[in-house]
Amino acid sequence: MKQELIERFTRYVKIDTQSNEESHTVPTTPGQIEFGKLLVEELKEIGLTEVTMDDNGYVMATLPANTDKDVPVIGFLAHLDTATDFTGKNVKPQIHENFDGNAITLNEELNVVLTPEQFPELPSYKGHTIITTDGTTLLGADDKAGLTEIMVAMNYLVHNPQIKHGKIRVAFTPDEEIGRGPAHFDVEAFGASFAYTMDGGPLGGLEYESFNAAGAKLTFNGTNTHPGTAKNKMRNATKLAMEFNGYLPVEEAPEYTEGYEGFYHLLSLNGDVEQSKAYYIIRDFDRENFEARKHNVENIVKQMQEKYGQDAVVLEMNDQYYNMLEKIEPVREIVDIAYEAMKSLNIEPNIHPIRGGTDGSQLSYMGLPTPNIFTGGENYHGKFEYVSVDVMEKAVQVIVEIARRFEEQA
């Protein structure tokens, strides 16, 4: 199993599937289509049925039941795309067997070193096989680790028919990283009673609470004149953007928050004197606090418009997803089964809120309750990203055990 995980994962991450926030196609990048087509062929090779890929790039497949019991249909999902935060082109995965727990030089030429000082969890992977980047790209373990685990688990169940299970549906979705994953997901066609996203992090992660999330795009319009004669004429759009940011609470940013604390995050700022554009994400677990944060942004914009003119600041703000806890609580047994599956495999479940979102956040509100399970990755979205193959193997075992337990309890 370990070799299959390594072979599939290292092959998958070499395919550039970064999504693109600026694109309006579905999926937003051709790499996701290419990857989806490959997975369709490999799902068929494994022996799954009803393998489809629709016009929007959503891949679905079925592992038929091998029991006569009336077992609910379970889904397992992962996403095709990788993050936009750092380059995902020309990924060169580096395999470190029997890791010694010490610093790893990822790139000697660029002096990129993965150290326990910067990443204290690193020594806990001593003895594991870990896969890192070469220091020039992200790895793409988010979410190609989860995707690989689903593929390997399905292959394992096909070749071990003594493990009884109900019908299992698999889906791989595009554009999760930019919040559009479930936008065109056909819940009815998928046909599962509930599902699990394999999109978590370290060993034991079991998550069924997510942020309420919104995105805010602000356009600041200035007036550019020669700086030598600019008095009472110039309006600097970049300074307007700085002023807006200054109104937000400094301590309510990602770098100062944890646990159940929400934040405002300036994701990007580009521009000049004439025009500047800022993109923020707004996050909070509590719905009332979430709404209050959005109102705060609107109020700041209103104040600035009163001060500088209506056209000085233009706000576009949209909700992205909501806390899935509300939809999962009524079917709590799907969390309990996953919890029991982990315990039976000597994995200590680590239940904590997702300081982010998964496809499950939106799918839960579309009628498909979907908690999230660990995959074994660390330091997502950057050059220090890595994954433990040993933990990936545990994730495969959890998928298999969840399927087995639902059949056993039917």
UniProtKB/Swiss-Prot annotation:
<keyword id="KW-0862">Zinc</keyword>
<dbReference type="GO" id="GO:0008237">
    <property type="term" value="F:metallopeptidase activity"/>
</dbReference>
<dbReference type="InterPro" id="IPR001261">
    <property type="entry name" value="ArgE/DapE_CS"/>
</dbReference>
<keyword id="KW-0479">Metal-binding</keyword>
<dbReference type="GO" id="GO:0008270">
    <property type="term" value="F:zinc ion binding"/>
</dbReference>
<dbReference type="InterPro" id="IPR002933">
    <property type="entry name" value="Peptidase_M20"/>
</dbReference>
<dbReference type="Pfam" id="PF01546">
    <property type="entry name" value="Peptidase_M20"/>
</dbReference>
<feature type="binding site">
    <location>
        <position position="142"/>
    </location>
    <ligand>
        <name>Zn(2+) 1</name>
    </ligand>
</feature>
<keyword id="KW-0031">Aminopeptidase</keyword>
<dbReference type="GO" id="GO:0006508">
    <property type="term" value="P:proteolysis"/>
</dbReference>
<feature type="active site" description="Proton acceptor">
    <location>
        <position position="176"/>
    </location>
</feature>
<dbReference type="InterPro" id="IPR010161">
    <property type="entry name" value="Peptidase_M20B"/>
</dbReference>
<comment type="function">
    <text>Cleaves the N-terminal amino acid of tripeptides.</text>
</comment>
<keyword id="KW-0645">Protease</keyword>
<protein>
    <recommendedName>
        <fullName>Peptidase T</fullName>
        <ecNumber>3.4.11.4</ecNumber>
    </recommendedName>
</protein>
<dbReference type="InterPro" id="IPR036264">
    <property type="entry name" value="Bact_exopeptidase_dim_dom"/>
</dbReference>
<dbReference type="GO" id="GO:0045148">
    <property type="term" value="F:tripeptide aminopeptidase activity"/>
</dbReference>
<dbReference type="GO" id="GO:0043171">
    <property type="term" value="P:peptide catabolic process"/>
</dbReference>
<feature type="active site">
    <location>
        <position position="81"/>
    </location>
</feature>
<keyword id="KW-0378">Hydrolase</keyword>
<feature type="binding site">
    <location>
        <position position="199"/>
    </location>
    <ligand>
        <name>Zn(2+) 1</name>
    </ligand>
</feature>
<dbReference type="Pfam" id="PF07687">
    <property type="entry name" value="M20_dimer"/>
</dbReference>
<feature type="binding site">
    <location>
        <position position="381"/>
    </location>
    <ligand>
        <name>Zn(2+) 2</name>
    </ligand>
</feature>
<comment type="similarity">
    <text>Belongs to the peptidase M20B family.</text>
</comment>
<feature type="binding site">
    <location>
        <position position="177"/>
    </location>
    <ligand>
        <name>Zn(2+) 2</name>
    </ligand>
</feature>
<keyword id="KW-0482">Metalloprotease</keyword>
<feature type="binding site">
    <location>
        <position position="142"/>
    </location>
    <ligand>
        <name>Zn(2+) 2</name>
    </ligand>
</feature>
<dbReference type="InterPro" id="IPR011650">
    <property type="entry name" value="Peptidase_M20_dimer"/>
</dbReference>
<dbReference type="GO" id="GO:0005829">
    <property type="term" value="C:cytosol"/>
</dbReference>
<keyword id="KW-0963">Cytoplasm</keyword>
<feature type="binding site">
    <location>
        <position position="79"/>
    </location>
    <ligand>
        <name>Zn(2+) 1</name>
    </ligand>
</feature>
